[in-house]
């Protein structure tokens, strides 16, 4: 199970939101590349980038920052989400050195877009399912759909989606613990490996996820916990490596 540090980008800065609310953000720094270096130096094997402005705008806004991080760490797998709603955007990011693009809103509104992109960019497509009480939210989490997250995961089972990033919105940025049960349900809904996100606070959450990782959980994204020091990614990754051996 991979421990994946998150770098959320808003107005060019590295921030963290609470429950996805843009007006409830904490700015951690003005140099996202420096934060990326900090996590790389601690042994991160992948980075999770989110263009928060892009998620609301429906197109990349912090793309230059994403490109700068990708160029600074050419050997490091990077995944990007937020505002990815066209083949052109996906192609742009992949050419810039990003390894995986996360399709969120468009996956809910036009599932066939995911099917097509998996054919066009095989091995590079991740679906982001952000759920509130089990139902998928879209447009920077501003809207909640009537689509169940597990149903959508099952829909993509044979499309060639690389992974699913599953976020429990109610827990995101709240430091209240990860929703293990919902994450396992998501993993069981399809054969696609699931990356857990939202609420990861400390080693208790990592242990809880590692215990059920065999259900199909391939990673855990952590943001506020590593910025505020309640979780050490070196310790967390070392634990996951030992448990998986």
From Swiss-Prot:
InterPro entries: Aldolase_TIM, His_biosynth, HisA_bact_arch, Isoase_HisA-like, Isoase_HisA-like_bact, RibuloseP-bd_barrel. Its EC number is 5.3.1.16. It is an enzyme of class 5 (isomerase). Keywords: Amino-acid biosynthesis, Cytoplasm, Histidine biosynthesis, Isomerase. Pfam families: His_biosynth. One of its GO terms (biological process) is L-tryptophan biosynthetic process. It is found in: Cytoplasm. It catalyses: 1-(5-phospho-beta-D-ribosyl)-5-[(5-phospho-beta-D-ribosylamino)methylideneamino]imidazole-4-carboxamide = 5-[(5-phospho-1-deoxy-D-ribulos-1-ylimino)methylamino]-1-(5-phospho-beta-D-ribosyl)imidazole-4-carboxamide. The active site is at 8 (proton acceptor), 130 (proton donor). Pathway: Amino-acid biosynthesis; L-histidine biosynthesis; L-histidine from 5-phospho-alpha-D-ribose 1-diphosphate: step 4/9. Coiled coil: none annotated. GO terms for molecular function: 1-(5-phosphoribosyl)-5-[(5-phosphoribosylamino)methylideneamino]imidazole-4-carboxamide isomerase activity. One of its GO terms (cellular component) is cytoplasm. Its main location: cytoplasm. CDD domains: HisA. PANTHER family: 1-(5-PHOSPHORIBOSYL)-5-[(5-PHOSPHORIBOSYLAMINO)METHYLIDENEAMINO] IMIDAZOLE-4-CARBOXAMIDE ISOMERASE. HAMAP family: HisA (MF_01014). Belongs to the HisA/HisF family. This is 1-(5-phosphoribosyl)-5-[(5-phosphoribosylamino)methylideneamino] imidazole-4-carboxamide isomerase. It comes from Teredinibacter turnerae (strain ATCC 39867 / T7901).
């Amino acid at each position: 199970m991979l421990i994946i540090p998150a770098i959320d980008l808003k107005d060019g800065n590295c921030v963290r939101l609470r429950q996805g609310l843009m007006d409830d953000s904490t700015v951690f720094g003005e140099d996202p590349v420096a934060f990326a270096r900090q996590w790389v130096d601690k042994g991160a094997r992948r980075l999770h980038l989110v263009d928060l402005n892009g998620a609301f705008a429906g197109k990349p806004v912090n793309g230059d920052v994403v490109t700068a991080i990708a160029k600074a760490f050419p050997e490091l797998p990077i995944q990007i989400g937020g505002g990815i709603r066209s083949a052109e955007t996906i192609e742009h990011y992949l050419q810039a050195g990003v390894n995986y693009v996360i399709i969120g809103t468009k996956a809910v509104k036009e599932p066939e877009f995911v099917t097509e992109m998996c054919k066009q960019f095989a091995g590079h497509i991740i679906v982001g399912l952000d759920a509130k009480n089990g139902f998928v939210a879209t447009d920077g989490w501003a809207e909640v759909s009537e689509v169940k997250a597990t149903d959508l995961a099952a829909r993509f089972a044979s499309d060639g989606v690389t992974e699913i990033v599953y976020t429990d919105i109610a827990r995101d940025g709240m430091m209240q613990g990860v929703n293990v049960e919902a994450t396992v349900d998501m993993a069981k809904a399809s054969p696609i490996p699931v990356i857990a996100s939202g609420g990861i606070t400390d080693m208790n959450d990592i242990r809880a996820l590692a215990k059920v990782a065999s259900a199909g959980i391939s990673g855990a994204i952590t943001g506020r916990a590593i910025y505020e020091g309640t979780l050490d990614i070196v310790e967390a990754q070392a634990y996951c490596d030992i448990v998986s051996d």
